[in-house]
């Protein structure tokens, strides 16, 4: 579960079709997770953005925007009944868990809610893309793959 659509996702009407989606696809493959077995969605259903010239840049959603999308998120989870949800980023984790969390403080731990028996928190693929250097990006990718492997093992 991502945080919110990005520019390309907003235009396409499909989550994870932009650069972060490519990072996620590569990480899923490296973790041995078949894309066909994964349901991708976002916690916040609209793209909040700020204009920068001709570009639309991501802006962090407010708590009220996260809460406004709760009914859709709860409906998705109640219908899908996933065994595991991987929250990509702190905004997605807050939406699923109903409280503020940090990726660093919760990565690697199995959490739960009344709708999902196992919740994992990891970095959003866009954070990997924004890393300052190649070594940081490689470290971020390796952590994402490890987190996805852990979640996949729990789903079995």
Model-predicted regions and their roles:
Residues 1-156:
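A polyanion-binding, active-site-adjacent surface
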């Amino acid at each position: 579960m991502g945080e919110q659509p990005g520019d390309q996702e907003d235009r396409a009407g499909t989550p994870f079709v932009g650069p972060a989606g490519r990072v996620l696809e590569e990480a899923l493959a490296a973790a041995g997770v078949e894309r066909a077995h994964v349901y991708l969605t976002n916690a916040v259903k609209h793209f909040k953005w700020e204009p920068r010239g001709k570009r639309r840049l991501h802006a962090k959603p407010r708590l009220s925007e996260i809460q406004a999308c709760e009914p859709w998120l709860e409906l998705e989870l109640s219908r899908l009944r996933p065994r595991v949800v991987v929250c990509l980023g702190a905004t997605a984790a807050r939406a699923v868990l109903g409280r503020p969390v940090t990726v660093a403080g919760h990565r690697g731990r199995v959490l739960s809610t009344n709708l999902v028996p196992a919740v994992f928190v990891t970095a959003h693929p866009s954070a990997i893309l924004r890393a300052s250097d190649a070594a940081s990006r490689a470290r971020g990718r390796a952590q994402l793959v490890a987190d996805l492997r852990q979640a996949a093992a729990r789903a079995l």
